[in-house]
Amino acid sequence: MNWTNAINDFNDYLKIERGFSVNSISSYKEDITKFKKFINYTKNPLEVNSDDIKGFLHDISKELNSTSQSRVISGLRSFFEFLIFEKYIKDNPLKLIESPKTSRKLPDVLSLEEIDLLISKIDLSIEQGERNLAIIELLYGCGIRVSELVDLKISDLFFEENFIKVTGKGNKQRLIPIGNITKQNINNYLLNSRNKIKVINTFKDHVFLNRRGKNLTRAMIFTIIKKLAKKANFNKSISPHTFRHSFATHLLENGADLRTIQQLLGHESITTTEIYMHLDNKYLSEALNKFHPRA
């Protein structure tokens, strides 16, 4: 089996059987291609051994941090597990390879005052103003991922029931409650500025569009937020994900439990959600004083 066939079969497996998104599949393919180039096509996938893997990992350690290295190892391990599953090979060359220990970096979070300041920098006099306001309110009001936002459809909005439906990682769908402020801003955009756009048929059901009637991309959302952060003179690094972190942190600060936040964020494991516990020492201190018998 050559590399092209192996990678294509693996991509089909990830898409059809695992339900992975296009972006996830692309990341896997990119990492496998890097390894293929490293061994300079001298071996086919069935001939790779642990020494080849170790040499590759030593090479990428010069340019990638531990988190990125772990991602590459995970991707390669999955690829060779697939080859085992298909009975092309018997052993995984990454069987004894350990991922590097990663430090858990706490995400940047915006205070409510900072979010209000950012929103105040949106120019509502321009045609994109209502759209940009709806985007910020949705990112913060529902804590959705930027990929979920750009894929959001009008048919996913259940405003009478106060819910929206989003499609997350692995094409998993979940319902998220939506508050009145967020709902009102989306409605204003849909009824006013979006109505003035000549929408291309393919994108008629997409909520957020550019001036040419096509759906917004993740890169466009990043650009919108970066420009607003610059206007607000923020020193911290701001991205669409910052609003997701802020959403979760503010819920925790105001008494929401981790299981609820986990469901709202669409985390498979509560371990992923637990990082927000480290962001609010005041909350932890108050919890101990309130609930511990010796406090």
Predicted segments, located by residue:
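Conserved catalytic core of the tyrosine transesterase superfamily
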Residues: 1-295
